């Protein structure tokens, strides 16, 4: 008896028994009902991934390595403990976990999907949802703190630090709740009419809820940066000095980069999920062929975030260069003078004494490289935070 014939003979009572026992046949049943099983084209194709499995894992590993490098560089070589420092660490950590969750999701996809218990399936998908949510919540928190820094009166460092810690903890708590909601009961197990075609055990109501949450986050981020830009532009018009106008242009470029990155990376995924929610199963199956690319594009946003939020800061650039320099020294790939000279030359335009690295003769002593706090950590913040 094939899967299609067997699934038609399954009664609601037997389906609930499969769910209670945590049997993997429940996943097969849901995939067959959604049409995902018929569209996989056999088990030898890797469950729709096929030749994309290798590049997908490689892309996820690159996201992990990129964010791990930035995370280590900021944590080791930057002495600043202002609020932006914690925001950058939070964004980088969430993007690193997004890359890890994506790699785990790809490795457990394909034929391995039907070897998972329902709980493991919910954890596989929920971990990726949680990581993506943490990344977007972190971007929203950073935008909110930038705006609050500009409009609030000066406050004590202890008060600001406590609020930053609390908001970071809230970001991760909300992300964990959002990712675990299906495991906690918001799912469509044995309720096939309410099931998503793209994520066969997820309720369409939950998918719609996630789309609305992510869309509201995007609108809030763009609104906050738009307000920040208006404040900076107004200050620049009051001040005829060229640095103020350059700061306004730099902020505008950053806001445009954030907008383009969000629309390009998240727009296709939003469209796919909306088609799944409001379209028919046949319509959803037509878009299903591009699901792997669309999900990879959303994860790619975690590779772009360091370029927007971290590498645009000269202080972070110096930290990353110092981290790479010490790695070269440890591997013996180039002499300390050559390595450190390149870093010094990269920032020699600021000041002859602005070099934040001191040449050392060994890898051990190179770890004590120090940075001068000559400029704000964030290139798009108009005032120093206390």
Curated annotation (Swiss-Prot):
<feature type="transmembrane region" description="Helical; Name=3">
    <location>
        <begin position="121"/>
        <end position="141"/>
    </location>
</feature>
<keyword id="KW-0807">Transducer</keyword>
<feature type="topological domain" description="Extracellular">
    <location>
        <begin position="185"/>
        <end position="208"/>
    </location>
</feature>
<keyword id="KW-0564">Palmitate</keyword>
<feature type="topological domain" description="Cytoplasmic">
    <location>
        <begin position="78"/>
        <end position="87"/>
    </location>
</feature>
<dbReference type="GO" id="GO:0005739">
    <property type="term" value="C:mitochondrion"/>
</dbReference>
<dbReference type="InterPro" id="IPR004061">
    <property type="entry name" value="S1P_rcpt"/>
</dbReference>
<feature type="topological domain" description="Cytoplasmic">
    <location>
        <begin position="142"/>
        <end position="163"/>
    </location>
</feature>
<keyword id="KW-0325">Glycoprotein</keyword>
<comment type="similarity">
    <text>Belongs to the G-protein coupled receptor 1 family.</text>
</comment>
<feature type="topological domain" description="Extracellular">
    <location>
        <begin position="276"/>
        <end position="290"/>
    </location>
</feature>
<dbReference type="GO" id="GO:0007189">
    <property type="term" value="P:adenylate cyclase-activating G protein-coupled receptor signaling pathway"/>
</dbReference>
<dbReference type="Pfam" id="PF00001">
    <property type="entry name" value="7tm_1"/>
</dbReference>
<keyword id="KW-0297">G-protein coupled receptor</keyword>
<dbReference type="GO" id="GO:0098793">
    <property type="term" value="C:presynapse"/>
</dbReference>
<feature type="topological domain" description="Cytoplasmic">
    <location>
        <begin position="230"/>
        <end position="254"/>
    </location>
</feature>
<feature type="transmembrane region" description="Helical; Name=1">
    <location>
        <begin position="57"/>
        <end position="77"/>
    </location>
</feature>
<feature type="transmembrane region" description="Helical; Name=5">
    <location>
        <begin position="209"/>
        <end position="229"/>
    </location>
</feature>
<feature type="topological domain" description="Extracellular">
    <location>
        <begin position="1"/>
        <end position="56"/>
    </location>
</feature>
<keyword id="KW-0472">Membrane</keyword>
<feature type="transmembrane region" description="Helical; Name=6">
    <location>
        <begin position="255"/>
        <end position="275"/>
    </location>
</feature>
<dbReference type="GO" id="GO:0038036">
    <property type="term" value="F:sphingosine-1-phosphate receptor activity"/>
</dbReference>
<feature type="transmembrane region" description="Helical; Name=7">
    <location>
        <begin position="291"/>
        <end position="311"/>
    </location>
</feature>
<feature type="transmembrane region" description="Helical; Name=2">
    <location>
        <begin position="88"/>
        <end position="108"/>
    </location>
</feature>
<keyword id="KW-0675">Receptor</keyword>
<dbReference type="InterPro" id="IPR004064">
    <property type="entry name" value="EDG6_rcpt"/>
</dbReference>
<dbReference type="GO" id="GO:0004930">
    <property type="term" value="F:G protein-coupled receptor activity"/>
</dbReference>
<feature type="topological domain" description="Cytoplasmic">
    <location>
        <begin position="312"/>
        <end position="386"/>
    </location>
</feature>
<dbReference type="GO" id="GO:0005886">
    <property type="term" value="C:plasma membrane"/>
</dbReference>
<keyword id="KW-0812">Transmembrane</keyword>
<comment type="function">
    <text>Receptor for the lysosphingolipid sphingosine 1-phosphate (S1P). S1P is a bioactive lysophospholipid that elicits diverse physiological effect on most types of cells and tissues. May be involved in cell migration processes that are specific for lymphocytes.</text>
</comment>
<feature type="transmembrane region" description="Helical; Name=4">
    <location>
        <begin position="164"/>
        <end position="184"/>
    </location>
</feature>
<protein>
    <recommendedName>
        <fullName>Sphingosine 1-phosphate receptor 4</fullName>
    </recommendedName>
</protein>
<keyword id="KW-1003">Cell membrane</keyword>
<feature type="topological domain" description="Extracellular">
    <location>
        <begin position="109"/>
        <end position="120"/>
    </location>
</feature>
<feature type="lipid moiety-binding region" description="S-palmitoyl cysteine">
    <location>
        <position position="325"/>
    </location>
</feature>
<keyword id="KW-0449">Lipoprotein</keyword>
<feature type="glycosylation site" description="N-linked (GlcNAc...) asparagine">
    <location>
        <position position="2"/>
    </location>
</feature>
<dbReference type="InterPro" id="IPR017452">
    <property type="entry name" value="GPCR_Rhodpsn_7TM"/>
</dbReference>
<keyword id="KW-1133">Transmembrane helix</keyword>
<dbReference type="InterPro" id="IPR000276">
    <property type="entry name" value="GPCR_Rhodpsn"/>
</dbReference>
<feature type="glycosylation site" description="N-linked (GlcNAc...) asparagine">
    <location>
        <position position="32"/>
    </location>
</feature>
